[in-house]
Regions:
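Residue-level marker of alpha-helix boundaries and capping positions
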Residues: 8-10, 46-47, 85, 130
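Boundary/entry segment of secreted carbohydrate-active catalytic domains
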Residues: 1-15
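Catalytic domains of carbohydrate-active enzymes, especially glycoside hydrolases
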Residues: 15-37, 101-105
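Glycine-rich, positively charged N-terminal anion/phosphate-binding segment
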Residues: 35, 41-60
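Active-site-proximal loop/turn and secondary-structure-junction residues that shape catalytic pockets
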Residues: 9-11, 34-36, 74-76, 110-114
């Protein structure tokens, strides 16, 4: 059996040290949410470049840790078209970055049909699900 961990649940250390620590703890894969794990360099959409992916991939490989999931947990059910466009752009950047990183999965959530990303009873309805599916299609 191989065990993985959400990297943002590990000891807060500089990126390279954190991944080495994950290996020392016995984990072989991790869930990477860049903004929650990395503080010493930017992880904005524009920063998610092939060069950054190559650097990070080498750090993971050196420590025998795979990236199992690249986390991008934003509200794809957001009803505000301007906010949704930014969210969609962020997902596209993460999907590209995941492919360069050698990660086959970008994590998401179904979201909430409001701008505040608040859990409300409407989150569990058919309309919310269809909104999510509609908004997910351009991303995948």
């Amino acid at each position: 059996m191989q065990l993985g961990i959400r990297l943002h649940d590990t000891k807060k250390l500089p990126f390279e040290e954190r991944i080495a620590n994950v290996h020392e703890l016995g984990f072989v894969c991790g869930h990477l949410a860049p903004g929650k794990v990395i503080s010493e360099f930017p992880t904005t959409d524009e920063a998610l470049t092939p060069g950054l992916a190559m650097y990070m991939k080498n750090v993971f490989a050196k420590n025998q840790v795979d990236v199992a999931v690249l986390g991008c947990y934003l509200n794809l059910a957001n009803p505000n078209p301007e906010q949704l466009a930014k969210i969609t752009h962020r997902y596209m950047a993460h999907i590209r970055f995941a492919s360069w990183l050698g990660c086959g999965v970008v994590g998401t959530e179904t979201g909430a049909p409001n701008e505040t990303y608040t859990a409300v009873p409407e989150c569990h309805g058919e309309e919310a699900l269809q909104t999510f599916i509609t908004n997910l299609r351009p991303v995948v």
